[in-house]
C-alpha cells in the first residue's frame, strides 16, 4: 500500500523529478563512488570492516594486525574499563547496540530502567565532569562501569525514558524519547595523594553526558580532507536559514588545527592512544598511567600483589590500529539514478524495485528541498598528499579524491529547548559549547541496521530511527526540520528511503 502510494506520488510529479535528475544527473551518478578509490561495493555485515582496494604489501599485513587488535580483547585492559576492545563498542567497525537501550530492570511502579549491564561491556561512554565542565580526573575522563575480577566499578549508569507524542501537519503521529541519566553505585573511596586518606565524592557535585559509539566509516578520508575547504565552508553560512557553522580549533601534540574527529570535532587525529587508555584502561606510551590512578583501590591492588608497571599496548600495535582505521573502505551508495551502472540493490542484497527507485529519487530531491545539504554537504575533496599516520607514514592513496560524506565537519547549534532539554548537554569540548555538535557524516548510515542490527542515532542514542533523528534537530537545524514536517507523507517516506540508500 505504501509502495503504491509512493509510485503514485512520484508519477504525479514525474516532470519535476525528471528535470531535477536531468540537471544533476552526472553529479548524482558520481555520488555512488562515495570515497573515490576507497569505495567498496559491499552490502554485507562487513561493509564497514573491509579494507580499501589500494591496500597491499606490508600495509595489508599491518592492516590485518590492526584488525585483530581492534576486535579482540585488549591484553592488559582494566582494572576498570568501559569496553574490553575497540570492537566491543564498534562491532564490525560500526556502532554496537548501545547500553542506553539495554533493559536492566524496572522501578517499583513497573517503569523500565535501562543502562549499564554486567556482561563486560556497555557500548557507551559516560563523560563525568564537575558542574563547571572540567573533567573529574579520578574517574579517568569517562565512567568505567565494567571491571576485572575483584575491582569495583566507578559507577553504573541508569537511564529512564520519557516519551512525548506529536503529529505532523497531515495528522500522522510520532513519538520522541528523552533520556534521563543517573549514575548510581558511585565508587566513592578516592585516594588523596597529599592527605593520604579517603574522601567522599558527592554525586551532586558531578554531572554526566552520554555518547554512543560512532561508525568508523571514512576515517582515513576524513583525515585527508583539505582543511582549507572546511574553513571556507565555515565562512559561507546561510543566514536565510539560520545556518552558520564554525570550526573547532584544537591544540593536540603541540599542533593547533581544525578538529574533525568526534561528536564535537574535538580531536585532530583518530585518538587511538586515548581510546586504549580512557575506554579500555590499557596503558601506552602516550598515556602510561592507569586511568584509575587516583583511586584508593589502586593502592589496595598493590597490596594484593597486582602490578601496573608495564605498558599494556606497544607503540607498534597502536600504529597498526591507526593504519587499520585509515585504510577501511567506504560502502558505495547503493541506489543511484536509472542511468548509473551501479547495481541497484537494497542493504539486504535484494533487487530494488522500480517503485523503490522512484522513492529514492524523490527522497533525494526532498533532501535538497529541506536544505539538509547545507550542513550535510554532499561533496568534499582530499588534499593531494592524502593522510598522515601517527608515526609519520604518508598515505598518498587517500589524496586528490572527490568524496561524498554528507557533512561539513563543522559545529552547529542544534538547539536547547525541545521537550525541555534539546541536544544541549552543557558539556564543552574545545571551542564547542554544549549546544554545538559536529555535523554527522551520513555515508554508510543506511547500512547501520545491516551491520549492527539497530537504528539508534544521535550522540546519546535517543533517536530510534531516521524520522526521530530529524525531529530532534533544533537551532540551526530548525528550518530543515520544519520543512521536513511540512512535507506530505510520501515525501517524508521517500526522504527516509534516500537516507537508507547511503
Tell where the protein language model's regions lie, with residue ranges.
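Sec-dependent N-terminal signal peptides
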Residues: 1-4
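C-terminal motif of bacterial Sec signal peptides marking the signal peptidase cleavage site
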Residues: 6-9
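Periplasmic c-type cytochrome electron-transfer domains
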Residues: 11-502
Amino acid at each position: 500500500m505504501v509502495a503504491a502510494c509512493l509510485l503514485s506520488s512520484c508519477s504525479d510529479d514525474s516532470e519535476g523529478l525528471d528535470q531535477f535528475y536531468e540537471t544533476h544527473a552526472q553529479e548524482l551518478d558520481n555520488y555512488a563512488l562515495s570515497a573515490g578509490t576507497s569505495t567498496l561495493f559491499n552490502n554485507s555485515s562487513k561493509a564497514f570492516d573491509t579494507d580499501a582496494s589500494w591496500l597491499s604489501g606490508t600495509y595489508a599485513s599491518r592492516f590485518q594486525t590492526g584488525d585483530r587488535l581492534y576486535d579482540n580483547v585488549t591484553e592488559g585492559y582494566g582494572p576498570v574499563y568501559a569496553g574490553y576492545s575497540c570492537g566491543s563498542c564498534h562491532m564490525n567497525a560500526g556502532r554496537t547496540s548501545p547500553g542506553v537501550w539495554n533493559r536492566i530492570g524496572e522501578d517499583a511502579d513497573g517503569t523500565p530502567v535501562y543502562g549499564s549491564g554486567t556482561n563486560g561491556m556497555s557500548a557507551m561512554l559516560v563523560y563525568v565532569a564537575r558542574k563547571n565542565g572540567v573533567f573529574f580526573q579520578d574517574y579517568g575522563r569517562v565512567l568505567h562501569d565494567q571491571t576485572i575480577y575483584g575491582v569495583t566499578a566507578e559507577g553504573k549508569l541508569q537511564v529512564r525514558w520519557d516519551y512525548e507524542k506529536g503529529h505532523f501537519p497531515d495528522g500522522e503521529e510520532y513519538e520522541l524519547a528523552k533520556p534521563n541519566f543517573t549514575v548510581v553505585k558511585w565508587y566513592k573511596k578516592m585516594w588523596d595523594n597529599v592527605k593520604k586518606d579517603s574522601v567522599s565524592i558527592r554525586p551532586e557535585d558531578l554531572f554526566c553526558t552520554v555518547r554512543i559509539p560512532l561508525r568508523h566509516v571514512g576515517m582515513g578520508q576524513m583525515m585527508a580532507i583539505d582543511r582549507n575547504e572546511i574553513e571556507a565552508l565555515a565562512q559561507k553560512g546561510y543566514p536565510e536559514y539560520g545556518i552558520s557553522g564554525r570550526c573547532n580549533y584544537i591544540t593536540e601534540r603541540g599542533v593547533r588545527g581544525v578538529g574533525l574527529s568526534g561528536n564535537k570535532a574535538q580531536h585532530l587525529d583518530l585518538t587511538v592512544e586515548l581510546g586504549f587508555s580512557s575506554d579500555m584502561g590499557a596503558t601506552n606510551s602516550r598515556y602510561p598511567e592507569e586511568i584509575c590512578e587516583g583511586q584508593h583501590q589502586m593502592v589496595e591492588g598493590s597490596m594484593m600483589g597486582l602490578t601496573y608497571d608495564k605498558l599494556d599496548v606497544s607503540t607498534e600495535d597502536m600504529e597498526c590500529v591507526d593504519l587499520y582505521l585509515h585504510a577501511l573502505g567506504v560502502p558505495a551508495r547503493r541506489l543511484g539514478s536509472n542511468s548509473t551502472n551501479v547495481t541497484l540493490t537494497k542493504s539486504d542484497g535484494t533487487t530494488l524495485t522500480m517503485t523503490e527507485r522512484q522513492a529514492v529519487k524523490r527522497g533525494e530531491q526532498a533532501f535538497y528541498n529541506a536544505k539538509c545539504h547545507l550542513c550535510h554537504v554532499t561533496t568534499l575533496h582530499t588534499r593531494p598528499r592524502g593522510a598522515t599516520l601517527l608515526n609519520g607514514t604518508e598515505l598518498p592513496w587517500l589524496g586528490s579524491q572527490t568524496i561524498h560524506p554528507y557533512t561539513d565537519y563543522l559545529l552547529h547549534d542544534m538547539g536547547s529547548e525541545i521537550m525541555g532539554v534539546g541536544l544541549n548537554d552543557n558539556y564543552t569540548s574545545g571551542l564547542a559549547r554544549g549546544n554545538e555538535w559536529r555535523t554527522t557524516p551520513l555515508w554508510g548510515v543506511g547500512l547501520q541496521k545491516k551491520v549492527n542490527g539497530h537504528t539508534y542515532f544521535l550522540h546519546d542514542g535517543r533517536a530510534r530511527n531516521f524520522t526521530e533523528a530529524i525531529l530532534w534537530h533544533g537551532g540551526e537545524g530548525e528550518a530543515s526540520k520544519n520543512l521536513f514536517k511540512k512535507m506530505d507523507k510520501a515525501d517524508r517516506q521517500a526522504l527516509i528511503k534516500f537516507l537508507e540508500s547511503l
